[in-house]
């Protein structure tokens, strides 16, 4: 019998603090930094994003999304035998205990299931999903909880208008299970460390002292130019692996980085933007959380239906990129 991994539940969570472009314009003005709604929207497509309260961590957001995904899957927390959590903003500096272990505790999972974090920034959820797929297909695990959760508002520099307007906080989750019916059809992951300096968190700790910046850095133009070509290439790679044509893809659920990157990707694939789930306008760029959040939106509003083919793809710091083609 051939084993497949199949998504049987999705969930997402946005912290309640919604921040509009006007809110940011007023905040930046206090430091003498000028921007406008037109400038932000024309370059990114973003009108609003959400920020977590100071006492909320990535694990808190992750737990809410996970509960919703488990509810849709009709599974209890103790039915999960592996948790994979993608984040670049873990609960603890240094990354341990892992945020996945914190989520395990907060969900009340007591079965001793494995729990691990994955760090590939905005590609993180794709990396986590592809990893879960391999564990399930090997027969070693049956029910896997895959989460992307971020509090990027903690690491953006509000004196840099080119980046601070882009990012937001949130979480998304899926439950995957072993199935005799095709679910995940193909996955492909890549990385190229030679581009590590165009999107990074350059600071490091030495002897308890921060060296360098505590904030993220992004060369937006370099990322934009690289991203469109890489996303087109990896999308075609998974289509080839699945022996499918782009016309057979019902929906693209991309990393919600920038509307221009998404438009460029759709154009290269010869697909209409009508086939793309877009949430960047209201969520901003939520890094590893963006794909599962957008997927959940598409599932819950009825656009993404059982049996349809969904392409999930993303690029992130490292430089990392990848794609997953799945039948819902």
UniProtKB/Swiss-Prot annotation:
InterPro entries: ACP_syn_III_C (IPR013747), ACP_syn_III_N (IPR013751), FabH (IPR004655), Thiolase-like (IPR016039). The active site is at residues 122, 255, 285. NCBIfam families: fabH, PRK09352.1. GO terms for molecular function: 3-oxoacyl-[acyl-carrier-protein] synthase activity; beta-ketoacyl-acyl-carrier-protein synthase III activity. It is found in: Cytoplasm. This is Beta-ketoacyl-[acyl-carrier-protein] synthase III. HAMAP family: FabH. Keywords: Acyltransferase, Cytoplasm, Fatty acid biosynthesis, Fatty acid metabolism, Lipid biosynthesis, Lipid metabolism, Multifunctional enzyme, Transferase. Catalyzes the condensation reaction of fatty acid synthesis by the addition to an acyl acceptor of two carbons from malonyl-ACP. Catalyzes the first condensation reaction which initiates fatty acid synthesis and may therefore play a role in governing the total rate of fatty acid production. Possesses both acetoacetyl-ACP synthase and acetyl transacylase activities. Its substrate specificity determines the biosynthesis of branched-chain and/or straight-chain of fatty acids. Belongs to the thiolase-like superfamily. FabH family. Residues 256-260 are annotated as: ACP-binding. It holds the Pfam family ACP_syn_III_C. GO terms for cellular component: cytoplasm. SUPFAM superfamilies: Thiolase-like.
């Amino acid at each position: 019998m051939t084993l497949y991994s199949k998504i049987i539940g999705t969930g997402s969570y946005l912290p309640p603090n919604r921040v509009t472009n006007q809110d940011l314009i007023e905040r930046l003005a206090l430091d003498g930094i000028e921007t406008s709604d037109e400038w932000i929207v024309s370059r990114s497509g973003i009108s609003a994003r959400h920020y977590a309260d100071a006492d909320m961590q990535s694990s808190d957001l992750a737990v809410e999304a996970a509960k919703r995904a488990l509810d849709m899957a009709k599974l209890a927390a103790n039915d999960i035998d592996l948790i994979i959590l993608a984040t670049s903003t873990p609960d603890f500096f240094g990354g341990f205990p892992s945020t996945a272990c914190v989520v395990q505790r907060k969900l009340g999972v007591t079965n001793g299931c494995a729990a691990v974090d994955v760090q590939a920034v905005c590609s993180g959820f794709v990396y986590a999903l592809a990893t879960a797929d391999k564990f399930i297909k090997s027969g070693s695990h049956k029910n896997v909880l895959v989460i992307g959760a971020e509090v990027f508002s903690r690491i953006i520099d509000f004196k840099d208008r080119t980046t601070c307007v882009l990012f937001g906080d949130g979480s998304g989750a899926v439950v995957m299970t072993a199935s005799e019916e095709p679910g995940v059809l193909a996955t492909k992951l890549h990385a190229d460390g030679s581009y590590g300096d165009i999107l990074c968190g350059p600071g490091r700790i030495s002897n308890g002292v921060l060296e360098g910046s505590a904030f993220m850095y992004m060369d937006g133009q370099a990322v934009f130019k690289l991203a469109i070509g890489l996303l087109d290439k990896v999308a075609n790679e998974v289509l080839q692996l699945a022996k499918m044509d782009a016309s057979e893809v019902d929906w693209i659920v991309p990393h919600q980085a920038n509307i221009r990157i998404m438009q460029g990707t759709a154009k290269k694939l010869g697909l209409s933007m009508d086939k793309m789930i877009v949430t960047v306008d209201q969520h901003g760029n939520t890094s590893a959380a963006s794909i599962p959040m957008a997927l959940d939106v598409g599932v819950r509003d009825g656009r993404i239906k059982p049996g349809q083919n969904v392409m999930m793809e993303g690029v992130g710091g490292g430089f990392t990129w990848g794609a997953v083609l799945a039948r819902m």
